[in-house]
């Protein structure tokens, strides 16, 4: 308390801080040397406290005694170490600006201040007592600690749950892998048995057929030898000059027996395969059918799984001459992912497209707003043929010029054949419709879902074919094609279109604008 009173007596009345280089006026009042000179420059030479004029010609003199006292006060008296004062403020802490004890906390500047700061720099700031500010901060820290502990408890619980789920996934994956391995082992074993049995049956049938062929060959050789001997004997008789001998021996000459028909060999491919051919076809169909394999997602997702090779065009045991002639210009095509509507999902190396209810997201600038997709290849010259398999009716097949609109312009759900720059065939449940320039021609329906498209740019013909159960032309467009043509398709929700490929056929690898000749 005495030290605080002493500091108040040693405070300059102008700056309210401890004297700095103290000087004494003739009236007896003391001030900082710099403070009094600044005061006189602004207010005239007079004492700031008693207003006594300062005589002209007099000089300010430094108060040596007061300066010594200030040095002792600033150094501070030596204190004996006492008990730990606890977590309160350090009583020796002083304001770095004014050298006075820190008594308040300035919330505006976020620091401890002295009494001088409160009447000068922090006069308009929000202030609080040190103990009150400490209580407030302690409450905030305790609340933060409680929230942190709750988060730690929650994180530990989530970590335990995550470990539990990971363990369950590992166990489930092991069980599934074991089950799948067992099923595939049984399937492979059954296939191996069927394979061995089928090969053995074919080998037995081949051995029997070849043995029959050898018997027939031996019979024919014996007959050939008898015929040769008979011919040789006839030539000998013809050279006989004695008429009596000729007549007698010619009567004794016996011709060889009749040859008889060739016995058909007991070999029938259909009989050898039997039900195995149908079984293998159904099995391959189940394995290659989209979504039938174990673990396939119920709905399409954005991931890109490893795809199996695309389907090949079905080759019947006997191909009609018309279709075999069309195959001479066969083209292996792929769908263009950029043009696909946002509800279309491509698979099998872009050979198959499916219309799903779930959207892949917003479409790109080159995608159709309508339920359509086009191929990645286009044609400007030459003769081209391709085949498409539809899962059901309500699909449209066609070709178009590059300027086919991507957006919906009218009431129709597609724009294939609705204008002058496209030609299309709409496959409905009970009929067909050939569309061009907004006009449609109704045609009888077809039962098969395998269709062919033949484009002859030189003659200006676009012909659609039905390939099941037999090959027959459906409709032919005649036009003067003067721009590149791109195959384009429309399909209803739930429908699937597959571009069939032929081994050895031309497979254009260029971009969409590539011109094939």
UniProtKB/Swiss-Prot annotation:
UniProt GO MF annotations: ubiquitin protein ligase activity; zinc ion binding
Source lineage: Eukaryota, Metazoa, Chordata, Craniata, Vertebrata
Domain B30.2/SPRY stretches: 313-506
Modified residue annotations for Phosphoserine: 185
N-acetylalanine, modified sites: 2
EC number(s) per entry: 2.3.2.27
This protein's name: E3 ubiquitin-protein ligase TRIM65
Catalytic reaction equation(s): S-ubiquitinyl-[E2 ubiquitin-conjugating enzyme]-L-cysteine + [acceptor protein]-L-lysine = [E2 ubiquitin-conjugating enzyme]-L-cysteine + N(6)-ubiquitinyl-[acceptor protein]-L-lysine
Organism annotation: Homo sapiens
One Pfam family hit: SPRY
Zinc finger (B box-type): 90-137
